[in-house]
């Protein structure tokens, strides 16, 4: 999936993936897509809930070995 920006949050523990995601989203325009790479298993639930509560769309989420990838479209 095409993204406008990629955020490398691998190796970061909760809550840092969310903190970095929020900061990166603030730099995007509405409709743009942020691709997030994380290794913290808690990021799956955290990013799903954060996306919904923030009015963003979690377009896709995949597990590639130890790396979780998320594509979030800014609302």
UniProtKB/Swiss-Prot annotation:
Designated name of the protein: Putative sulfur carrier protein YrkI
Family: Belongs to the sulfur carrier protein TusA family.
Location of the active site: 14 (cysteine persulfide intermediate)
InterPro entries the UniProt entry points to: TusA-like (IPR001455), TusA-like_sf (IPR036868)
Domain of life according to the entry: Bacteria
Record Pfam families: TusA
CDD domains attached to this UniProt entry: SirA_YedF_YeeD (cd00291)
């Amino acid at each position: 999936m095409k993204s406008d920006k990629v955020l490398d949050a691998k190796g970061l523990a909760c809550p840092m993936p969310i903190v970095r995601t929020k900061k990166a989203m603030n730099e995007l325009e509405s409709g743009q897509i942020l691709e997030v790479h994380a290794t913290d298993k808690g990021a799956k639930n955290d990013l799903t809930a954060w996306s919904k509560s923030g009015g963003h769309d979690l377009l896709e989420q995949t597990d590639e070995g130890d790396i979780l990838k998320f594509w979030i479209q800014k609302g």
